[in-house]
Amino acid sequence: MGKGCKVVVCGLLSVGKTAILEQLLYGNHTIGMEDCETMEDVYMASVETDRGVKEQLHLYDTRGLQEGVELPKHYFSFADGFVLVYSVNNLESFQRVELLKKEIDKFKDKKEVAIVVLGNKIDLSEQRQVDAEVAQQWAKSEKVRLWEVTVTDRKTLIEPFTLLASKLSQPQSKSSFPLPGRKNKGNSSSEN
């Protein structure tokens, strides 16, 4: 098991961030709890990756963002991954996710950071404001995975978090230290 990865769960107020975490981790979902405002909470989860390894995730359930309120900058400095949440029945929440992705790219400078996007509340399809195809095209252009989920069906939540844990547990692709027995191109040699 790894050291534990810090994952920030963020999105507009009332998109279902806390409900997603409560359902995923504890199987709890109470209809009508959507209006409870979260200040900030941290959940611990041990998630099995696609390679069968358990990864410890520290899931930071952030306060719901509102008009004119940005995600506090300290989240960008320590996060290993992000779960961006919008509600399919709220176009503004999707637009905020687009802005959050741009902010992450700016602060993380496209470094190793895992991002998954969740379009929540697909059970409210008759109130849909975010077209599924438009959202998927955006996700593809941003090179992130997007799932449409509902907290009323816990199974829809498992795959995104399994993929996230798998991405976070992958060994770093390049080391900044030379491997023993290999010559570095940049090293000057005095053996001439």
From Swiss-Prot:
The gene is NKIRAS1. It comes from Macaca fascicularis. GO terms for molecular function: GTP binding; GTPase activating protein binding; GTPase activity. Atypical Ras-like protein that acts as a potent regulator of NF-kappa-B activity by preventing the degradation of NF-kappa-B inhibitor beta (NFKBIB) by most signals, explaining why NFKBIB is more resistant to degradation. May act by blocking phosphorylation of NFKBIB and mediating cytoplasmic retention of p65/RELA NF-kappa-B subunit. It is unclear whether it acts as a GTPase. Both GTP- and GDP-bound forms block phosphorylation of NFKBIB. InterPro entries: KBRS (IPR042227), P-loop_NTPase (IPR027417), Small_GTP-bd (IPR005225), Small_GTPase (IPR001806). GO terms for cellular component: cytoplasm. It comes from the Eukaryota. Residues 168-192 are annotated as: Disordered. This is NF-kappa-B inhibitor-interacting Ras-like protein 1. Residues 58-93 are annotated as: Interactions with NFKBIA and NFKBIB.
